Amino acid sequence: MTKKYLFESIVKIRDFECDMQGVVNNAYYHNLLMQTRTEFLESIGIIRNEWSVERGIDFVVYETAIQYRSPIVAGETFRSCLNMHREGARYIYIQDFRRESGELCMRARVDVAVGLNGKLTRGEIFADYMKEHGVEFQEQPASRRTNSKIPNHIDDVIYDYEMKVRDYECDRYGSATNAFVQRYLEVTRLEFMEEMGETFRKWHENGVDMMVSKVDLKFIRPMMAAEKFHSLMNIRQDGPRVIFEQEIRRKNDMQLCVRASVEIVGIVDGELDTQGACFFHFINNQVPEWHSKNKM
């Protein structure tokens, strides 16, 4: 590959990391991305657990945008590549998954902040450490994300699904991992489809695969073990894409925990539906009809 990266590692996909189609589940990408960032930190002498316990320093994921390009299947080996720069108080990881041929399978932007004793900082601790250890990174002015598709709020919630955070879905701090947060969003979409009498398998049998092409997530508050929450959703079409606008709010006080935008494209008989025609009846007829009977 001609592109230079700050860090690379080799990853092999195992059967248990895949779904029924034998491809890596979209939510599991968060674990793979975290694994690479952790290995990068370890390569420069930072053990996350030790920094947290001994120094009170934690790395907090604030926002994630994942673009899925080509499915990764069971048994495949790929290169997990990482670059990083700084924008104000945030450290921006640009992460690529590439096959040995150089083909890009996935690209992610992960915004990370540095916390000290439970409070967010300007990130100087991390910057000073990297400079002392000869790690080169660019520093850029802080800027607002202009390409984020995450809505500020959902104008019209058409579906509300209640769930609960389980212990096994949490990290050592007792909060739901990013992978499980994305899984909650996926479960909500699946339950919504099933309530309308639709399933992704049914669409597949009719020659249409609904493929997630992009996920934007903003993590606002941690979701703690045993907490109940509402997973809220709206759906609309934008050209060839169906957009699921989603929020997660705590049940006890309706505080916002997560905002998300999930883009779906249609693959019809193996070809991308560039007009999104496969969704027209669903969006313009089925969804409004279901909504009129189930208004919240």
Which functions belong to the PLM regions below?
Residues 1-40, 140-198:
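Catalytic strand-loop segment that frames the active site of acyl-thioester-processing enzymes
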Residues 1-69, 73-75, 194, 273-296:
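Hydrophobic, helix-prone linear segments
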Residues 7-9, 68-77, 81-151, 219, ...:
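HotDog/MaoC-like acyl-thioester-processing domains
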Residues 8, 61-63, 92, 160, ...:
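Short coil/loop residues immediately preceding or within conserved phosphate-binding loops
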Residues 45, 197, 264:
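Short, small-residue-rich loop/turn micro-motifs
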Residues 55, 60-64, 76-80, 211-215, ...:
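A generic structural signal for short beta-strands and their flanking turns/coil linkers
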Residues 168-258:
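Structured core of small recognition/catalytic domains
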